[in-house]
Amino acid sequence: MSQRLPQRIDLLAMADAGRTLEGRIEVTSLDRVLPLLHDTEGVLDVVMRMDRDPDGTRFVAGTIEGRIQLLCQRCLEPVVLPLNLAFRLGLVADQEEASRLTPRYEPLIVTAEPTRLADIVADEVLLAMPQVPVHPEQELSLIHI
């Protein structure tokens, strides 16, 4: 998977067309994640399928795979967080529509403006990150030998 993803897309049109995007996104494009990282090098593999379900709900379902490097708050050394994330987002226009969304989707409020793909990826990565990154106990003992 070496293809670069487009920066912005019309999610509603892509869902209506039943499109799938596969590619890589640079970690450096995840603006809200960058301040939380120890190292900003690397790429994440992303697959996003946009479609309508049998009820007519537009959605984005996908996966994000890769690794990010955080700072262990116990020893202040780098700690790698492997990412193997799956998500299902229902595309809605407002909070009222979001409240009617079935539980199988998390709401994503979209407008007529094209959506920045890096923002969707950043949201999912932020949700996967621990509040306090630390090495697992077995790794920590090896660091201090």
Where do the protein language model's features map onto the residues?
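A positional/architectural concept
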Residues: M1-Q69
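Short, intrinsically disordered, charge-biased short linear motifs at domain edges
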Residues: G56-T63, D123-H135
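Cys/His-coordinated zinc-binding microdomains
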Residues: L76
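Cys/His-rich microdomains that often coordinate metals
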Residues: V79
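Short Cys/His-rich "knuckle" micro-motifs
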Residues: P82-L85
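Conserved small/polar residues in nucleotide/adenosyl-binding loops
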Residues: I143-I145
